[in-house]
Each structure stands twice: as structure tokens, then as C-alpha cells.
Design a protein with these regions (language model features):
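Short, Lys/Arg-enriched N-terminal segments with co-localized hydrophobic residues
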Residues: 12-29
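Iron-sulfur-associated redox domains of electron-transfer enzymes in respiratory
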Residues: 21-24, 32, 36-283, 287-288, ...
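C-terminal, charge/polar-rich interaction regions
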Residues: 276-336
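Intrinsically disordered, low-complexity segments enriched in serine/proline and basic residues
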Residues: 2-3
């Protein structure tokens, strides 16, 4: 039953028969907030159809319409700290539209270690100017955990000396309108804070006094980031769960929407990796992991369980320690 439901979701767009746009007073064309939330939660991509190939593509037209009546785009300062840069790589893999359209039409990227052209002192000067000129307006995106031991790591150098991740995040976090922790390291510590955590890495929320919106994942799905940014732009703060993650994307467990749920309910568990039955016996932590991977998919192609490998719970606050050993059944994991 659930398997058939999942197949139907992939083959039929839930938005073919509803009106997405509303003409508001003043001639503005905006996506209603309720419809935006439904879009984020339910949109099923069609890999072979550019018109339905990704959530980012679907949202972009609405964001562009919004910008037509606005004077500015959403200002963003993107800071990389103790991370592997996997999240910006994941976002670069968004298939349609490509990253350049997101950067040009949705946000005003004021600073980014990866995407900016400036370097050295010019880059630092740009950062200082952006932070001061856009104070209380910009969204701070932090990718990576914050190392606390000896205030390491260094994220940039000024004429006055080195600036650590801790110093930079505290400075920029105090000026930002919103703070988004991008990836599990920034959200909860993640692999950077895994045992024995010699760098004493911490989540962004542990070093700031303001609210932090956690967009966890190792790496994040591009849709989770694009959708969160679009919500901040058009509607402000999204509804968050008890871990400060947007319920748009982290509202339900992997287990609830998994295409193999019927196998679990009937007690049919895989005996080896690569088999088609439920992966619970092979270490899957889907029952405690909140994300919409079963129908969101990755790069509009696939997701781990459909590729015959267990979910390792990369969006969880206790990842990776709470998921190891990866191929041990959930009740037997050391820290679950």
C-alpha cells in the first residue's frame, strides 16, 4: 500500500490541479504561504522534465515574481568554519536551475569563502563593509562547527591579526537578522564534534545567544537550503521543530515515508546489504531520523535506501556517534 502510494507520488505532481498564484492588492503576484509550505513538503521532482525537475526550479519563478515588486534581494553572508565544504558542493549540484540563477535572482551574496571572486584583504574589507551596511538585514549562513579549543580555526586574517571561527561567528551573529546553521556540523556539531572531539567543536547555537535555524544534513539536500532561504525572503522565520529545524523538511521520520515500510510492518527484513527488504536489520536509523529523503531524493535521482543501503541518520543531533557502528541494528548501536 505504502509502496504504491510512493510510486504515485513520483509519477504525479500534486500541484497540477491547484492554483499556485494569487493576485493580491497592488498588483503583486505572490505564492501564498500555505501553498509554499505544501510545495516544500510534497513536491515530487520529475528528473526527465525540466518543468518539474526540482523544488528549487519551482520556487525560483515565485521568488523572481516577488523580487519584481521589491527593491532588494535577501542579503546573505556565508561563512565556512570547521567543515568539509560538502554542503556548498551539494548545493552546487542542484540540477535545474543551476546555482548561478539562485545566486543572481534569489539572494545577494555579500561574502562567501567559496563563491566570491575577491580574496585576501579585499575579501575581508568586503565582509566588514557588508556587515556594517546591512546590519539587522542580512542572513548569516554558517557552514561548519565552531572549534573552541584555543579558539581554532582561523577563517580569515586582518591587518590586526588572525580571526577565529568563534570570533567571526560571534561578531556576525550579533549583527544578523537571521542565523542559519547549514549542515549537521553547524547545526549540532556533527562529524567535527565526533568522539573524541579533540578540537572541542560545538554547534553554532552553543556559541550564540540568538535563535539559530538549523538546516541539518551531511550534506544537506539543496532543496532544504533553497526552501529555507526562500521562506525567510518571502515570509520570514519558518515553523521550527524542537531542534530548530524547519518542519517543512524535517517534519516526519524517514521510516514513516520509506518505500520499504510495508516490508518492516510485515516483518520482512533484509539479511544482507543490497537486498530489497527493509534495512532495519542492516543498521538503518530511519525510525529516529527526521527528513523527507524518500520522496525528495538526491539530485532528483535516488536516495540511500532505494539504492539498497541503510539510512545513517545524517540529519540527527547525535550523528555520527549515535549511528555507529553503521551496519549494526538500531537497538544495538552504542549511543542510540
Amino acid at each position: 500500500m505504502l509502496l504504491e502510494y510512493s510510486r504515485n507520488k513520483f509519477n504525479n505532481s500534486p500541484f497540477e490541479n491547484i492554483r499556485l498564484l494569487e493576485i493580491l492588492k497592488g498588483g503583486e503576484v505572490l505564492l501564498k504561504r500555505k501553498e509554499f509550505i505544501n510545495l516544500c513538503r510534497n513536491y515530487s521532482p520529475r528528473p526527465n522534465n525540466k518543468e518539474h525537475s526540482s523544488l528549487a526550479h519551482k520556487i525560483l519563478a515565485e521568488v523572481t515574481s516577488y523580487h519584481d515588486s521589491q527593491t532588494e534581494k535577501l542579503p546573505v553572508i556565508w561563512l565556512e568554519t570547521n567543515c568539509s565544504c560538502d554542503n556548498n558542493i551539494s548545493i552546487m549540484n542542484t540540477t535545474y536551475p543551476y546555482l548561478d540563477r539562485f545566486l543572481e535572482e534569489t539572494i545577494d551574496l555579500l561574502y562567501s569563502n567559496t563563491f566570491m571572486a575577491a580574496q585576501g584583504q579585499d575579501a575581508v574589507n568586503n565582509l566588514k563593509a557588508a556587515a556594517n551596511q546591512k546590519a539587522d538585514q542580512f542572513t548569516l549562513v554558517v557552514e561548519g562547527a565552531i572549534p573552541l579549543k584555543e579558539e581554532y580555526n582561523v577563517v580569515f586574517i586582518t591587518s590586526q591579526g588572525e580571526v577565529s571561527a568563534l570570533e567571526a561567528v560571534k561578531w556576525l551573529g550579533g549583527l544578523a537578522k537571521y542565523v542559519v546553521a547549514l549542515g549537521t556540523c553547524a547545526s549540532f556539531g556533527g562529524p567535527s564534534a565526533a568522539r573524541p572531539n579533540l578540537s572541542q567543536s560545538a554547534a553554532v547555537s552553543e556559541v550564540l545567544d540568538c535563535e539559530v535555524i538549523n538546516v541539518s544534513g551531511c550534506p544537506v539536500n539543496a532543496d532544504w537550503f533553497v526552501g529555507t532561504i526562500a521562506h525567510l525572503l518571502m515570509y520570514g522565520r519558518p515553523e521550527l521543530d524542537d531542534r530548530n529545524r524547519p518542519t517543512l523538511f524535517y517534519g516526519y521520520t524517514i521510516h514513516r515515508n520509506c518505500q520499504r515500510r510495508s516490508y518492516f510492518d510485515n516483518g520482512n527484513l533484509a539479511e544482507n546489504l543490497g537486498e530489497i527488504e527493509c534495512m532495519f536489520s542492516q543498521g538503518c536509523v530511519g525510525p529516529k531520523t527526521r527528513a523527507d529523503c524518500p520522496y525528495r531524493q538526491w539530485i532528483n535521482v535516488n536516495w540511500p535506501v532505494e539504492a539498497n543501503t541503510p539510512c545513517i541518520g545524517c540529519t540527527n543531533p547525535d550523528f555520527p556517534d549515535g549511528s555507529t557502528p553503521f551496519f549494526t541494528p538500531l537497538p544495538e548501536k552504542k549511543n542510540s
